[in-house]
Amino acid sequence: MIYQGENLSVDYIENGIAHLVFNAAGSVNKLNIATLRSLGEAIDVLYKQKDLQALLLSSGKSAFIVGADITEFLGLFDTPEEELSDWLHQANVIFSRLEDLPVPTLSAITGFALGGGCECVLATDFRLADDTASIGLPETQLGIMPGWGGSVRLPRLIGADPAMEVITTGKPKRAKDALKIGMVDGIVSRETLIDASVSMLKQAIDGQLNWQQRREQKKAPIQLSPLEAAMSFNVAKGMIMKMAGKHYPAPLTAVKSIEQSANMHRDDALAIENKHFVALTRTDVAKSLVGIFLNDQLVKSKAKQAVKNSEPVKNAAVLGAGIMGGGIAYQSASKGVPVLMKDIAQASLDLGMNEASKLLNKQLERGRLSGLKMAQVLSSITPSLNYGGIETKDVIVEAVVENPTIKAAVLAEVENEVNEHAILASNTSTIPISLLAKSLKRPENFCGMHFFNPVHRMPLVEVIRGEKTSQQTIDRVVAYASQMGKTPIVVNDCPGFFVNRVLFPYFAGFSLLLRDGGNYQQIDKVMEKEFGWPMGPAYLLDVVGIDTAHHAQAVMAQGFPERMAKNGRDVIDAMFEDDRYGQKNGIGFYAYALDKKGKPKKNIDEKTNAIIATITDSTQPYTSEQISARMMIPMINEVIRCLDEGIIASPAEADMALVYGLGFPPFKGGVFRYLDSIGLDTYLDMAKEFEQLSPVYQVPDSIKQKAAAGECYYPAPKSSVSSPSV
């Protein structure tokens, strides 16, 4: 053994050929700070080996290296700028020393080689992959860019255009696609990967492969004429501004870094990369996107624990077909859980089956599943007008009309048909679960399972715990949601649960802003283009359905009369009274017509302003800042109240529910990350200006206390860098 560290070891595999194996104690290899330090030590040892003729890098895991340890990122981001830059430089010295070893080097890649793992293999002369390999630089998806030489070596290896596509999209390349663009030199089977790698290194040792030339290519300037450079970088910047927009600076920064260093040799180019990487770590966007990643890991770890605590769901049922029931049935069946879809009307069953068939056809057209698989999924959905076979089902999801009397009757009826261990779950958007449970003999076997529309696209499922719901029931339904490929978040019961409870104060802010003379088109534009929502409130109401919102608004007002009861007729009432329900009937705030692809396209409707005029006295100009504040303060206040009341368990789960359920701008990270970013005192000052408008603008005492104590909602990160040395 030449070197033995906690996460990697080096020994000779054959005479003169050293073998460095990444093999961390955990389930996967991560290029964390400890592993990086160990890699530096191993390379120091290799430089001292007099008989060294070649070096092979491989993994003792099914994946090569999944990337850097993202749990260390926020600490790195909090490190003083100069200290982080020094540390980054020292880290790059390690990869440059790997690249400069006086012998040929090769990486044998299995599974993922992402982020720092990709940057590590780029430092070697050759790369062989097995057919499971997936190689890429996903850093821009976290608001940063490659910082260990990825943006320097990749464009020199494969050319500027393909390198910029890999880096700016953040999407990994499968082995065959990586081979096409030159990221790897060959693909072999996993069984022969090491032998083939050793054989290739022997060819390099014998002079049959010019490893020195490959190496020098990565250390020299990018081979581009001035005209080629101008065209390449200008086109890339234009595409990025169109795709990523102004809210996500990392892709554009990466391109600018590559452009500025294009005519430089490696070490000078690395210094440019260092400067741009450090600048991105100072942005709130990077902290927000990394925060989302970490929050997602927390939510998924809770779901995994629930899966461990319960038996997998083998058979399920949906009560109520139509678009929603068909969507739920499709999602269950497509993930391998057969489902009985029951309705009292054949037309509804036909609609549900058509919805499932339509979604499967889209997958077939895109080449994502075969005709055989489509037939298998469809055949695992059983439409029925009766309860026959429901006694064998593990979980039954009720998805009938949003009416408490009807839902309670259906639930009581089906409880008599199922086995005593079966779980009943109601797909309701606003009705309290504890209210529906009153009709049941076994309320402990009942919970809420709130899907978002469209089911196949929206990742979130709210799992709602009623007063008498057992933990076993919660675990089983969380496990079922996970089986369906969804992200389940457990919330406690109240009207609207979490997502809809915080959405309707946002709509209240919109109604009040229109009452006070705001322009709905300007509000939509500000909330989309400036704040970053995928849809403004008027457009969102049209998509949700103004009739649906009108009904839900009444439920929320009944549940929280002190804040959500309306003081007179509002714009939702006015639209509802004029039979403007939104996309579903072609007219709401906007008018809708189907485009060439059959999707509803919104157009300005001249009558909308006349309807709004019936609930306001005059029009008033508002700044973007005023609009954002008046729209967001009611939602933020309600999110804080939900945390205070234990409706949602943590800031992390609240933020993920907002991002996955409502499309809260990811670059802002969720309400609590946003509050920490702007500062609680800043928020309190902003809210104070509007507190007389309505009770929804009055901030909870808890945030005042937190601000007075100088606290944040997320714990302050600890610096991951203790010294510049690695």
UniProtKB/Swiss-Prot annotation:
Substrate binds at residues 296, 500, 660. Its EC number is 4.2.1.17, 5.1.2.3, 5.3.3.8, 1.1.1.35. The record marks 119, 139 as: Important for catalytic activity. It comes from the Bacteria. Residues 311-726 are annotated as: 3-hydroxyacyl-CoA dehydrogenase. GO terms for cellular component: fatty acid beta-oxidation multienzyme complex. GO terms for biological process: fatty acid beta-oxidation. It catalyses: a (3S)-3-hydroxyacyl-CoA + NAD(+) = a 3-oxoacyl-CoA + NADH + H(+); a (3S)-3-hydroxyacyl-CoA = a (2E)-enoyl-CoA + H2O; a 4-saturated-(3S)-3-hydroxyacyl-CoA = a (3E)-enoyl-CoA + H2O; (3S)-3-hydroxybutanoyl-CoA = (3R)-3-hydroxybutanoyl-CoA. Pfam families: 3HCDH, 3HCDH_N, ECH_1. Keywords: Fatty acid metabolism, Isomerase, Lipid degradation, Lipid metabolism, Lyase, Multifunctional enzyme, NAD, Oxidoreductase. The active site is at 450 (for 3-hydroxyacyl-coa dehydrogenase activity). GO terms for molecular function: 3-hydroxybutyryl-CoA epimerase activity; delta(3)-delta(2)-enoyl-CoA isomerase activity; enoyl-CoA hydratase activity; long-chain-3-hydroxyacyl-CoA dehydrogenase activity; NAD+ binding. InterPro entries: 3-OHacyl-CoA_DH_CS, 3-OHacyl-CoA_DH_NAD-bd, 3HC_DH_C, 6-PGluconate_DH-like_C_sf, ClpP/crotonase-like_dom_sf, Enoyl-CoA_hyd/isom_CS, Enoyl-CoA_hydra/iso, FA_oxidation_alpha_subunit. HAMAP family: FadB (MF_01621). Involved in the aerobic and anaerobic degradation of long-chain fatty acids via beta-oxidation cycle. Catalyzes the formation of 3-oxoacyl-CoA from enoyl-CoA via L-3-hydroxyacyl-CoA. It can also use D-3-hydroxyacyl-CoA and cis-3-enoyl-CoA as substrate. In the N-terminal section; belongs to the enoyl-CoA hydratase/isomerase family. This is Fatty acid oxidation complex subunit alpha. The lineage of its organism: Bacteria, Pseudomonadati, Pseudomonadota, Gammaproteobacteria, Vibrionales. The gene is fadB.
